[in-house]
């Protein structure tokens, strides 16, 4: 990952800019630079991924314009060729160098052209103004706010803006900002039509698009690794990558508790099958408890399930950073939002299933995508998410929801069937029931966190303290514990997150008071 910061106005202070940018130094430990545009500043912390030389350092400048971008542009070679045909020249191998030529040629229409995950802030000399934009899913983070004098700031993380802005707001995915307005250029959750097809043709399309999504994300000048939980999604990503890169073993990592890890054996089975160089990170109860506060500080959220699931990811990424030269990690996020969680088995009809999928994609930047970004970036690594490939997401979201519902006796059947003949991973893994990530790391992880919360507050203290919050009021001692840690680092900024992630409680079988799939009546053998 990298970090970007735009302090957009003549009232901007260089010293304040410097201190704010330093707060996300771990996102980009290789180099740091601040550019004075004459009307504010653009700042960049670099984690070198494409073109590791100094030529790839940002901000990029051209004809008085300037840009900083935290992103990966997967079609940059094709776009570069088009620009070169028009006479543009380039001095680096960085994918982001083409952004200013694109701006000169296409203006705001450039954002729709990008097959990318990105957050950027661009200074336009002609108008002496700033333009900001974020990818359609929100895989790369971006926040904004105004300082006490009303000067606008954009930043990779809310921590850059704490103490500067009284209100910090997530930049809406699929939008660009210009002249005081946020304009949607692509909405991945606005589905006006759906398409059908027979099962085999649909699964063939899913297969080819996911393989393409993995292939794009293997393109890196820095070493690549893989998070392998042993569940379907990460195992498929690893299996596809192993077939695409047969010349050398993948490097894979998994994590589990020292007492009751569920997924370690499954991850080991996949690693043996694909022949990866596999590493296991074993953690204790104390590791979990010690990680809680730094995890919430990194996440910038109080959401229960996001915090739980982040503990394992944070600790495994810390181990990767400390023991290897890997810079890029491929992960399995976003599959659940597209094909369904355990709770979506209870969707009353196809329309309800589709509406829930649209909601999950619309809000994913506050939950699973946020978790992957922060836990990985705080350890100076970059996350890449093949299931978040724009063509893949667009195709699946437009599929007839009847096809995606669990009519097959097992969830996510379309993905499973799509790869049934490839034999990329063991069939036992391909057809394995889903387990929640925090549960898969170890059932005791959730239990240990709840025990800590129960020991922290009496019932009277819980009632008194939770009553102090008028937004997203804590409803368990665990949720209160997370909220109080959040407020320590992000005071008064709770509205950055829309609500607690929970199953759709209006559906039969989903009226629960905990986000864990373990409390659902259909959890069955998922946790075995």
Label the model's feature ranges.
Residues 98, 209, 213, 270, ...:
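Amphipathic alpha-helical segments that form well-ordered structural scaffolds
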Residues 157-160, 200-201, 208-209, 213-224, ...:
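Peripheral terminal appendages
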Residues 326-355, 363-474:
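Mid-to-C-terminal catalytic subdomains of enzymes
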Residues 96-97, 101, 116, 204, ...:
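An alpha-helix initiation/capping motif
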Residues 1-301, 323, 327:
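Cysteine-centered catalytic environments shared across enzyme families
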Residues 6-9, 100, 104, 315-321, ...:
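Short, amphipathic alpha-helical segments that act as regulatory/interfacial helices
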Residues 31, 90-95, 406, 422-436, ...:
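Short, surface-exposed acidic
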Residues 259-317, 323, 340-354, 374, ...:
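ATP-dependent adenylate-handling ligase core
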């Amino acid at each position: 990952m990298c970090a970007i910061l735009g302090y957009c106005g003549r009232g901007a202070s260089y010293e304040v800019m410097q201190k704010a940018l330093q707060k996300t130094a771990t996102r980009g430990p290789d180099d740091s630079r601040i550019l004075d545009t004459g009307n504010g500043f653009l700042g960049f912390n670099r984690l070198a991924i494409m073109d590791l030389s100094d030529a790839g350092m940002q901000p990029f400048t051209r004809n008085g314009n300037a840009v900083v971008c935290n992103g990966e542009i997967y079609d940059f070679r094709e776009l570069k060729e088009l620009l070169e045909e028009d006479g543009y020249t380039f001095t680096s191998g960085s994918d982001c160098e083409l952004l200013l030529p694109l701006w000169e040629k296409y203006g705001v229409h450039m954002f729709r052209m990008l097959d990318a995950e990105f957050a950027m802030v661009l200074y336009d000399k002609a108008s002496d103004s700033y333009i900001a934009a974020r990818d359609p899913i929100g895989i790369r983070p971006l926040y904004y706010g105004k300082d006490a004098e009303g000067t606008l700031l954009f930043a990779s993380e809310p921590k850059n803006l704490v103490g500067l802005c009284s209100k910090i707001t997530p930049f809406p995915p699929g939008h660009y900002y210009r002249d005081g307005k946020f304009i949607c250029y692509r909405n991945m959750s606005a589905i006006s039509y759906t398409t059908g097809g027979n099962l085999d043709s649909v699964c063939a399309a899913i297969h080819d698009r996911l393989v393409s999504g993995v292939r794009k994300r293997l393109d890196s000048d820095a070493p690549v690794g893989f998070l392998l939980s042993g569940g379907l999604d990460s195992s498929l990503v690893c299996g596809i990558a192993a077939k695409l890169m047969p010349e050398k073993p993948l490097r894979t990592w998994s994590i589990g508790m020292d007492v009751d890890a569920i997924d370690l054996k499954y991850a080991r089975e996949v690693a043996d099958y694909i022949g990866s160089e596999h590493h296991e990170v074993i953690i204790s109860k104390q590791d979990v408890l010690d990680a809680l506060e730094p995890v919430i500080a990194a996440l910038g959220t109080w959401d229960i399930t996001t915090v739980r699931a982040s503990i394992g990811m944070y600790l495994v990424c810390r181990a990767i950073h400390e023991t290897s030269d890997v810079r890029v990690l491929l992960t399995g996020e976003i599959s659940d939002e597209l094909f369904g969680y355990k709770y979506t088995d209870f969707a009353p009809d196809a329309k309800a299933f589709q509406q829930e999928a649209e909601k999950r994609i619309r809000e994913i930047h506050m939950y699973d995508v946020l978790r992957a970004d922060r836990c990985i970036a705080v350890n100076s690594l970059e996350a890449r998410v093949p299931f978040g490939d724009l063509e893949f997401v667009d195709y699946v979201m437009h599929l007839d929801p009847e096809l995606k519902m669990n009519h097959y006796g097992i969830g996510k059947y379309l993905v499973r069937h799509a790869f049934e003949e490839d034999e990329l991973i063991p069939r036992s893994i391909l057809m394995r029931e889903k387990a929640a990530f925090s549960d898969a790391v170890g059932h005791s992880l959730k239990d240990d966190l709840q025990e800590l919360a129960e020991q922290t507050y009496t019932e009277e203290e819980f009632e008194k303290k939770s009553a102090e919050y008028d937004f997203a009021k804590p409803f368990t001692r665990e949720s209160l514990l997370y909220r109080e840690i959040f407020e320590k680092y992000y005071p008064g900024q709770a509205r950055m997150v829309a609500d607690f992630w929970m199953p759709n409680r209006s559906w039969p079988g989903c009226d629960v008071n905990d986000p864990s799939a373990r409390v659902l009546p259909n959890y069955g053998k998922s946790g075995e």
